[in-house]
Amino acid sequence: MEVFESLKTNLVGKNARIVLPEGEEPRILQAAKRIVKETDVTPVLLGNPDKIRIYLEIEGVLEGYEVIDPHSYAVFDEMVASLVERRKGKMTEEEARQILQDDVNYFGVMLVHLGIVDGMVSGAIHSTAATVRPALQIIKTRPNVKRTSGAFLMVRGSERYLFGDCAININPDAEGLAEIAINSAITAKMFGIDPKIAMLSYSTKGSGFGESVDKVVEATKIAHE
């Protein structure tokens, strides 16, 4: 089964709710339209309710989605208190209130943290750093995971590849590379891919030399262990 069809099948009956912080962006609105029409997932869009509803009504989408205005949300004070607690002395109540009003990614991540939604998709108009930072500060990593890494899922016909890390870690050491490889394999399994790991470098069968090649060789050994 094609990877995205498999994902949609797995979500049937789960009542999943996914927040889309960039809710007024046309590409996000088109994505929300497809989500409503093609899946059982409920998109939760952040932004101006009137703008979003008018756009989706013109597109023929009258129900199956939710809109949250961060400036008038019923449990906003609860979100502020929870964010202050989560940051443990690194953010005042006033700072938390301001960032939740101004930054839709922080608002979206707090919805995930509080269990109001099941996940978040962002990054259409925000940088990787602006998208990932709130998640690192609030949700954090799984236990025993030392570093966060990114991964891209590439589909070429019936072939599926997952590349990591091409977004977050600039120059990881050998131990970091090994952990990224292992976590990428775990991510691949989530998409129904039986992972076979390839460690990439500019050396082909030992033809190249240097510190970066040595690091990849060492990372491969660590990953095997």
Task: Annotate the PLM regions.
Residues 1-225:
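Anion-binding alpha/beta catalytic cores of soluble intermediary-metabolism enzymes, centered on
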